[in-house]
Amino acid sequence: DNITGCNKPVFTGTTAPEAEVTLTIGGKTYSTKADVNGRWNITVSDPLPEGSNPYTVQATASNGASGTLQGGVVIDTQAQEITVSLSSASDTGVKGDFITQVTTPTFNGTAEAGARLTLAIGSSVYTFAADASGRWSFTLPEQLQDGVHQYTLTATDIAGNISTGTGSVTI
């Protein structure tokens, strides 16, 4: 997917044995020599900016034959804010107060598009995902007893960045 939470990524590949390999990215050029099996890696030493970073890799074999590969890597080092609320059908008291008479409430909110979410409430942990627009909705499959229930919502985006929110719902 070429998305990473590291702004100094390591590029790896395979080419002709002992070929000279250059990587151009972020206005800098990095070089290395492939090993006897053709394996190589280059660590970008200067931090790349957030967002899309095009790159070019060129390999030149000892016989002069060369090849070029172009691509891009997306740097995403920042976790996006997450929101959580009770759905309008579950929010039976004053809107937004997280007090409800619904024992299997539906939570909804926003996170980064495609983020993996984990809701921990009581001794249960549930995993689900945000859609392509970053919206998510989850209905508890098990009834909550009357009282205050603490929850933790964790979102992990595709680059591995983590956002966490905590709160409580009262039944």
Regions found by a protein language model. Give the residues of each.
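Short, solvent-exposed loop/edge segments of extracellular or virion-exposed proteins
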Residues: D1-T4, Q80-T100
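Structural beta-strand segments of beta-rich domains
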Residues: N7-F11, T103-F107
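Short proline/glycine-enriched turn/loop motifs at strand-loop junctions of beta-rich domains
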Residues: T14-E20, T110-R116
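Short strand-edge motifs at loop-to-beta-strand transitions and within beta-strands
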Residues: G38-I42, G134-F138
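Surface-exposed, short loops/turns at beta-strand junctions within beta-sandwich domains
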Residues: V44-S52, L140-V148
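Flexible, low-complexity linkers/stalks enriched in Thr/Pro that connect modular domains
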Residues: G67-S87, D91, D157, S163-I171
